Structure formats: C-alpha cells, structure tokens
Amino acid sequence: MNKYTVMAAGLVLSLGLVAGCGSSDGAEAGKAPEKGASDAPKDAPKAGGPVYSGPAIPGLADKQAWSLPRADAIDLGDTFLFVKTGAGEYASGGGSKDDPLDGTTGLLHSTDQPGPVELEFRDVKTGAVRKTLKVTTERVAATTWRDGVPAFEVRSSSTTESDGLSAEGTTTTITVYGSDGAELGKAEHEGDTPFHVHEGHLIEQADQATLQLTPIGGGQPRKVTCGGLQASCSFDPRNKDIDGGSGHAPLITGKYTFHVNNGSTYETDPEELVMSDLATGKKVWSSADVTPPKGVELDDKGVRTSGSIRVLDVRDGRILTAWGAGAFLTDTWVTATYDLASGKQIGGSTRYAYEDFPGDTINTEGSSVFSPDHQLAAAATERGSTVWQLADGTEVWAQKEGEKAMTPLRFSPNGAVLYGTTEESDDTVLAVDARTKKVLVKDLPEDNVPLSARQSGYGYVSTDAGFFVFPAAG
C-alpha cells in the first residue's frame, strides 16, 4: 500500500454508510424547494470574511479572492455549497471514515436528529451568494450525478413501528441536487442495510460477489458480479473503486462499469478487469484482450505471473492502467495507457517500486496523484517522489538516493506545484516545482495545503482562521 494515501487522508473523498439521514423541504424530503428556496438577487454582496494572514502558498496568488469565517464546503464545479446551521454557524465536514482520499469534503453535515439548516450556494470566483435553500435534514454529503457531474445528496428517514407482529421498518429518502440547487433525482431505500450514493445510483452489496446499482430517479437495477470460485467484490467509497481480489478499477466511469474476473485466491489465472456498458452490460474492453506493457513478467506460457492490476482512469477514449510487475515483485508496478477502440498501447510505460506502508486501510497500490489538468502524475516510490507525464509515460524527474524521500500529496490548481511530506515533516509540507523539483517552501502547515476547485482553477484552504479562496498563481 502507498504511504501517500494515508497522509492524504490525514490532511483532511465518498459517502458514508449512515442510514436514516436526509433532508426535507417542509415535511417531505426531495420536494421541490418552493418555499424553502430563494434565488440570490443580482446585486448580492460578495463574501466578507477575514483577511488571510497565513504563510504564502506556492501555486496560489498572493491575494485572496474572498473568504468566510471557519467553514468547509462541497465543491460543485463553479459553485461551493455551504451548510449553515440553526445557530447561524457554517458546518465543518470531515471525520467520516468514508471521506474521500483526496482531502475534499465528503460528509459536510450529519446529526442524530433532523434539524433545520440553510444550504448556501456561492460562486467559486467571487463568493457571491447565488441561491439559498432551507431544508430539514440529518445529512448533507458530496456525491456525483451521471457522467461524474458534481452533486450533493440529502437524506431523510422515517420509521414504521411494529404492530406487535411485524418488524419495525425504516425508509430512507435520498434526494440528489445539482450545483444550481435543482433536484436531479430521488430514490427510497427500505431497511437499515448500508448503501452508498455514486454517479446517480444507489450502490448496495447484493452478495459476496455482486454489487447492485439502482438508478436514482427510476430505471432497472443493474447487478455487477465478479467472476471466480468464491469471488469477492466490494465498493470502496473513499476512492470509488470496485475491489475484487488483486483487481481494482472505478466501479462506474461515465457510461461504463467495471467488474473483476478470476477475483479469488482459489483461481490460478490472473485477475482480469472487464469494462462493460452500464446500460446493456455488453463488454467494451478487457485487460485480457490487450498486451501487457514491457516490464510485466510473463511465464513460459505468456501468462502474467502477477494477478495484480488496476485501472487508474478512463477519459478521452483512453484507459490508464497499472500492472503488477511480477509474482515476487509485490511493490513494483508498470503503468501504461491503452486506446479504447483499438486496444493498442499509447506511448511508453513507467515502472516503479512503490513505497509500501502496511498501515494502509485502503488498496491504492500502483496509484499516483494527478495534476488537475491530467498532464502530470506523481508516484510514491521507494526513493521518494517521481513525476511523469500521463500522455506518454515520460519521466519528468525522480528523487535520487540520499535525498529525503518525499511522499506526494497533491498538485496545485494550475499543476505547477507538487506538495508532499517527508518522515521528518509530519506536521508540515514541502512545496516543490512540479517540473524541476526545486523546493519552493519546506515548512507549509498541513492546513494550508490547498485543494483545487473543479473547473474554475481556483484553490482554497480551510483553517481555524477561516475559509479562503485564491486564484491560481499567474
């Protein structure tokens, strides 16, 4: 497991297993926000929060764009969502075991009992209030709608008491909203079994080898089953992957879904990742149908000696993969990109021995952190950070023997700066030039490591002093 994943989680995405949470507009969750909603006037004032007085942050402009008092927010693309409680204070997220690994907010608001809150939609660049929505809820959390569109979900629950013979029953209503506060879809979940909300679907464990994907807003459920004798598959909300033995991939990516074949220790064939059409189940791509990249060890029959494989990303007709290098090279991975239509490898490949950390609670072996523009990737190798180009696998730079090994955390909004930690800097972070490795700052407080706002290119930090938004450095 890679040490950087634990560090990233410590600095702070998906949704929790908490049932019986939600929102309601009036008495009914998911109801059109007629009385509880208001569109902000065109002359709505900008945010008037504190002035940032912390250290300069490499990768961000010197002057903040706007700020608020202490708060956390859900990034909805061009909008930030804040939750204001009945006491008038902004909610602070984090603390959920299922929060995203990238440090962004997953669970923003959660209480044992429903209560009134105000949802506040602010423009990322100016801080101006675009809309407010009053609801009564127990839970507000980040999610995604179809094709990865940023969204948030609210839940409400009701309990049917036993009549003396029947069992007590719980119904949870889940409503998903978009960045403009409009309802995208609603669903109900019966019982108290755990579930997740992802890509416009309810994700549930149907049995040991099967996940059930139920479209929110209507539609036939789809079952994703991993193959193999006594195969086991599960969904991890922290990185949105399907986990099947030594095979890992995004459960849903756009119009596709993945499952794992030979996902069992009882299988002799290596794990196979299969991508299928989400609507029809028709196979679109399989790792078994492409040639493993150079550097992957094969036996005398041409079969991979390691079953470890993962899909890191699918976009623009390309699939980024990571392959276990060999049966006895458990921490060494080879990364390669394939054309979806032809199955041919695009560009070269990278081969690195990754830093292993047994304390990891999530499987991210062979993973890297990506710049927001997906131009660069940074891997946590045995000698420290290595940066490489996603397009062709070309190495940009790598730490040398004798240097203090840096574990990469994330890139700046413009991709120009890489932030990371060393064993000697648990509470502070290094900031280095992503292209040259030049150290820009060696003691940035961990709370001041910025997150990247989707689409806008702005960066933001949430500290005890406030919530601060900055343009990217020019």
Which residues fall in each region the model found?
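Short coil/turn segments at the loop-to-beta-strand junctions that recur within blades
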Residues: L68-D75, K134-A141, E183-F195, C226-C233, ...
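Blade-terminus and WD-like Trp-Asp/Gly-His loop motifs, strongest in beta-propeller folds
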Residues: I74-G77, K84-A87, D99-L101, A141-V149, ...
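Short loop/turn segments that connect beta-strands within beta-propeller blades
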Residues: V124-G127, G178-A182, P215-G219, D277-G281, ...
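Acidic, serine/threonine- and glycine-rich low-complexity intrinsically disordered segments
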Residues: G200, D207-L213, G217-W388
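Blade-level signature of beta-propeller repeat domains, shared across WD40, Kelch, NHL, RCC1
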Residues: R435-G474
